[in-house]
Amino acid sequence: MPAENSFDIVSDFDQQELVNAVDQTLREVQTRYDLKDAGVTITLTKTELIIEADSEMSLRSVRDVLETKALRRKLSLKIFDYGKPTDASGGRVRQVVTLRRGIDSELAKKLSKMIRDRFPKVQPRIQGDSLRVAGKSRDELQAVIAFLREREGEIPVPLQMTNYR
């Protein structure tokens, strides 16, 4: 039996599921009566999503459809960081949606402090855009996981626990 057990806390999402959600959103937008003539375009890159429509109301409707499709595909809505709608050419409206991936250093420090204060027997370590929590007792690590699941509403990014050993 290993002397120390550990798990990683990461914040990531399935890129293919996001592609599928965007495709389904475009398909629904093209068939919906209220959005059919809105000229909606959605451009997806690795780090952002650009939604363009003819009015702010259409933009909000597309956003609602996108969120519904993302939830059905088991994607957290916390991955979307919506920017302010801006005017685009031709009287259109554009909104840039930044996709959140990884745990930034400020949040990693906050999570590390939360874990250390509550569980003195485990050692959280920041590793780039993830956090490794190590401890001797598996029960203690499972308690940390349960604690983080309870606090999920306070954390601005979706968390996944991986590499539990």
From Swiss-Prot:
Keywords: Nucleotide-binding. SUPFAM superfamilies: YajQ-like. The keyword Ribosomal protein does not apply. Pfam families: DUF520. One of its GO terms (cellular component) is cytosol. Disulfide bonds: none annotated. HAMAP family: YajQ. Nucleotide-binding protein. This is Nucleotide-binding protein Caur_1852. The lineage of its organism: Bacteria, Bacillati, Chloroflexota, Chloroflexia, Chloroflexales.
